[in-house]
């Protein structure tokens, strides 16, 4: 089993992906590295670059990532369908 890199945001603990992540952390404690951090995104181009990098990680390395954004305005998380895309990926691969 690959190593899962889990980064979760704390703005709304009722989101579906948070429940999934918690379940995975409980089920596979030896395979998961848990990090918390804050990102400050200053431009759309930076945001897109980071999203593209995340997609490459998910596709090429078997890593899933949920981003902690509690230092940013919460609207950023919903922008461009990022939360939906990550949540859908988690459900597809891990449910």
For the regions a language model picked out, list residue spans one by one.
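Charged interaction segments
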Residues: 21-28, 42-95
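Extended, hydrophobic alpha-helical segments
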Residues: 1-41, 45
């Amino acid at each position: 089993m690959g190593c899962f890199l889990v980064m979760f945001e704390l703005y709304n603990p009722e989101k579906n992906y948070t429940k999934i992540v918690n379940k995975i952390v409980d089920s596979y404690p030896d395979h998961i590295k848990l990090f918390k951090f804050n990102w400050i995104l200053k431009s759309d181009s930076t945001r897109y670059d980071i999203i593209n990098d995340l997609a490459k990680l998910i596709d090429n390395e078997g890593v899933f990532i949920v981003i902690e954004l509690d230092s940013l305005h919460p609207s950023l998380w919903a922008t461009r369908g990022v939360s939906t895309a990550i949540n859908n990926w988690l459900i597809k691969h891990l449910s």
